Amino acid sequence: VTLPMIGNYLIHAASSHAGERGFGFNDMSERHTAWVLSRLAIEMKEYPTAFDKINLYTWIDEVGRLFTSRCFELADENGKTFGFARSIWAAIDVETRRPTLLDIEALGKYIDERPCPIEKPGKIMPAENKAEGIPYSIKYSDLDINGHFNSVKYIEHLLDLFDIDQFKTREIGRLEIAYQSEGKQGMPLTLHKAESAPDKQDMAICHEGKAICRA
C-alpha cells in the first residue's frame, strides 16, 4: 500500500464520517460551501501489504472559527497500529473561494478525546529557492470533483521527484504537506525538491514562482 493510496483512504473516510453527521459534501453544497484540506501530516510505523485488512478510524480533534482538525488511525484487524495522521480543514464559499465561519457548537458535539500521538503539522521551509523546478501542467486526470487539483495528486507528483529505486529499499516515515492555493486544469507548475537534513526533504509545487503547496 503506497502513501498516495493511504491519502485517498483518509480523504474518503473523512468524507464518509462528515456525511453521516450532517456536514458532508451534499450538506455543504446546499449551503454553497465546501470543505478544503489545508494541512495533512501522515506518520507511518509500517505500511500495510496489499493483503492486510485495514481498519481506519477518524475523529474530530478540535473546532475553531475558521478551521477544524481531524485525526486518523490505521490499524490491522488485530488492533496493531500501522500509523496515524492529522489534518486541518477549512470551509469555503464555493463562489468567492473565501473561508466561511464554522458552526462551532454543531461541530463541537463530535469532538473526540481519542489520542493521536504524532506531532501537529508545523512550519515547512521553502524548497523553491533551493532547487530548480521540473515543469508540469495540470491535466484532466489531476482534477477532483470540484474541478481543482486533487489533494492526493499533489502528493503523487511530489513523490515522482524521487528515484524509484529509493522506494525499493526505504519507506517514508512522515509526510507533511501544506496546501496554499488551488490548482486548475492547464495551470503550468514547477516541482521542487531539496534535501534540508539527512533523511529529510523539503518540496514545493509552484505556479509563476509562488508556492501552491509545500511538503
Where are these regions (language model features)?
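Hot-dog-fold acyl-thioester-processing enzymes
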Residues: 1-37, 82-86, 92-173
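Small beta-barrel nucleic-acid-binding modules, principally OB-folds
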Residues: 32-47, 170-182
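Short coil/loop residues immediately preceding or within conserved phosphate-binding loops
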Residues: 39, 69, 140, 174, ...
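HotDog/MaoC-like acyl-thioester-processing domains
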Residues: 43-126, 179, 183-186, 194-215
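Alpha-helix C-terminal capping segments
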Residues: 162, 193-194
